[in-house]
């Protein structure tokens, strides 16, 4: 259990000392991120598609409602079935349901083994590979397809038991990444510090497309670069100006998903016809 104002970095450091972690890898995005902000924003990192989201690790929460009344929901242990499951509703609520004062979270031990494999392939082939692997008993943890410097690569992170990770490396192929910077690269993916994010032009917004994992490659408007693909195909980041807002919304809806304006200048936000689409009930369980 942590107070809402506890710095997220401080909590993660304390957990790491005990070989524990928050498996959903909440992004910080800037210094000073707090536990309460993490829950209110409801954002998850690269491992989201494999391990679950913030709400899946919520055990209990205390809030102050609109009448100034202190309320507590849930508990501090897994076996907790009393009352309404308001704790999970707080994840991604952006403070609309109350001011969070403290949070109880489920944590897990760090994986005993980890490996990252790289594959040179286009987006369509990357999605095909991810769909095929998803139907196999492989310790998939995170994935990222990115086109950088003219080269398109799919990176897949494996986590789990030593034997499972080693067996997956042998069966999946690809090039095993042995650089000391690999863990930092995944952190850069989580924190949007990869070169792909840095190349965004000042007049471009960063769009977050939430799609079914089985969605095909999207035919983006002319002049819009290939997306960065995470969550085994379910999350696609797109850099585009406000003039492409309508097209992105239409593409996402046609694929059974939604588009949200994630990072933009005030001018972009004002000119975009709608910052975000409502998620379908099925997608709301994933994103």
Task: Mark where each language-model region is.
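Hydrophobic residues embedded in beta-strands of well-ordered beta-sheets
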Residues: 1, 152-154, 235-236
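N-terminal glycine-rich flavin-associated loop
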Residues: 1-30, 39, 43-76, 111-119
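Catalytic cores of large soluble enzymes that bind and process phosphate-bearing ligands
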Residues: 3, 53, 78, 118-122, ...
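Residue-level signal for inorganic ion chemistry
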Residues: 5, 156, 238
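Short, conserved charged micro-motifs
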Residues: 10, 124-129, 163-170, 214-223, ...
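Short, solvent-exposed amphipathic alpha-helical segments in soluble enzyme
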Residues: 16, 105-106, 132-135, 171-173, ...
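Conserved glycine-rich FAD pyrophosphate-binding loop
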Residues: 30, 177-287
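C-terminal substrate-binding/cap subdomain adjacent to the FAD-binding core in PCMH-type
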Residues: 40, 59-203
């Amino acid at each position: 259990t942590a107070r809402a104002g506890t710095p997220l970095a401080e909590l993660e450091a304390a957990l790491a000392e005990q070989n524990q972690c928050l498996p959903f890898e909440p992004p910080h995005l800037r210094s000073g991120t707090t536990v309460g902000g993490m829950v209110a924003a409801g954002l998850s990192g690269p491992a989201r598609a494999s391990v679950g989201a913030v709400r899946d690790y919520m055990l209990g929460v205390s809030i102050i409602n609109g009448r100034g009344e202190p309320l507590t929901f849930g508990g501090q242990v897994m076996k907790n079935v009393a009352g309404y499951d308001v704790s999970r509703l707080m994840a991604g609520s952006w403070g609309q349901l109350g001011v969070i004062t403290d949070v109880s979270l489920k944590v897990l031990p760090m994986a005993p083994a980890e490996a990252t494999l790289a594959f040179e392939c286009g987006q369509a082939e990357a999605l095909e590979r991810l769909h095929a692997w998803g139907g196999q008993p492989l310790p998939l943890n995170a994935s990222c397809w990115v086109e950088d410097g003219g080269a398109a690569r799919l990176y897949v992170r494996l986590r789990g038991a030593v034997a499972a990770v080693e067996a997956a490396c042998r069966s999946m192929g690809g090039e095993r990444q042995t650089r000391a910077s690999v863990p930092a690269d995944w952190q850069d993916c989580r924190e949007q510090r990869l070169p792909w994010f840095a190349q965004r032009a000042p007049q471009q917004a960063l769009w977050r497309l939430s799609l079914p994992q089985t969605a095909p490659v999207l035919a983006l408007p002319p002049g819009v670069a290939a997306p960065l693909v995470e969550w085994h195909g379910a999350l696609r980041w797109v850099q585009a100006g406000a003039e492409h807002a309508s097209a992105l919304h239409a593409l996402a809806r046609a694929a059974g998903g939604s588009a949200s304006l994630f990072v933009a200048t005030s001018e972009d936000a004002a000119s975009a016809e709608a910052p975000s689409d409502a998620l379908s009930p099925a997608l709301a369980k994933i994103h």
